[in-house]
Curated annotation (Swiss-Prot):
Residues 143-375 form the Radical SAM core domain. This is tRNA-2-methylthio-N(6)-dimethylallyladenosine synthase. The gene is miaB. [4Fe-4S] cluster 2 binds at residues 157, 161, 164. Keywords: 4Fe-4S, Cytoplasm, Iron, Iron-sulfur, Metal-binding, S-adenosyl-L-methionine, Transferase, tRNA processing.
Amino acid sequence: MSKKLYIKTWGCQMNEYDSTKMAELLHSTHGYDVAEEAEDADLILLNTCSIREKAQEKVFHQLGRWKNLKKNNPNLLIGVGGCVASQEGNEIRARAPFVDIIFGPQTLHRLPEMVNQVSETHAPMVDVSFPEIEKFDRLAEPKADGASAFVSIMEGCSKYCSFCVVPYTRGEEVSRPVDDVIYEIAQLAEQGVREVNLLGQNVNAYRGEHYDGEVCRFAELLHLVAAIDGIDRIRYTTSHPVEFTDDITEAYKTIPELVSHLHLPVQSGSDRILTMMKRGHTALEYKSKIRALKKARPDIAMSSDFIIGFPGESDADFEATMDLIQSIDFDMSFSFIYSARPGTPAADLPDDISEETKKKRLQLLQQRLNQQSMAHARRMLETEQRILVTGPSKKNPMELTGRTENNRVVNFVGQPHMIGQFVDVRITEVLPNSLRGELIREEADMGLRVDTAPEIILQRGKSSEPDELGVVRMPRQAS
């Protein structure tokens, strides 16, 4: 009977990606299969996020639920990873001594050694170091789970925005070698993946090395990914306006695989607040980048993030944010009331805005964003949209569901063989959280672009032998 692994994941898409890699890694080295419930597991991992308020207390609350499982099964191993573990490792050891393994986002690749050592010595382990690119060298081969996949191309952030904890929990920017990224995507394409979402805390700051030492910038990487046959959609998240350079804008003119949707967080429309946030750009510079992008790709849909109630935010600052929203006309966006993150510069600023004011501003801002979002959805009525079919609809299993380029969910009547393929539909109804469509054509009638077959990329380097833990390292091209 195989050993069971249960992973609970909180936070961003990068954490989701990391959890997938943990499961693949521990399956390849120790034979762990994923359990649906913590009660059935031999190893429980909590992958944490420190972005939201009271993140630490949320962790201890969850660990308290698992404490009895450990008491009833002394052989059960419990590990805590992610950004809270990186930030609060010693506190976790002190308040939850029954936790066996504490690891950071950059040391998840060492999980097999940690599991071995804890099993042998019965002594807890803590490793929240920042060993840079080593993490990616030790990952198991990717396994596709559907037609869309996440691929991490870099880690960390070097922008040090005053409100953000990421540089302190995930470290500064480290880019994967470009050949490793392309090889992983080719492996996924071989398994039927049609859409990749390139991940990074500051993804458009990517500076990965080729095997010959030459540096590949993000725009060049987009061209290389688009050339892989089978990859017909490229998304990426999360971007920073400062790193959104002209060559990336130009890529939207020449790469049809790049979806007509961009998430570009701005946080505020006030130059004064942007300066206090240490964002490195003005509202006008942000608008200028969007104008250039819409000139390159007129139908592009924009989304963003907004922080409300940052320390010192005046009525005028808030109105500047509302004006920016009005001028950009976002397709959809995310907004949050500011909460101080321990250890960040902004945490030392006085919280001089009442909760009532914060909530009122958030309500007004979300009302405007929702109005814009619904207006965009209504404009899609009776239009033809290409969607990637991801599976049966959650609300009606007799229907299929997929996403448009601008990330809208569409449900329609179709056949099971369409799952994992593209179809064109006519939008027939606009609902609050989704769209309905009517099938127009299937993928066989589309004539999608064909370029470099994945097997050609995979043949460029043969996999090395598994290491002592059974991990096959990513092959590198020889010069």
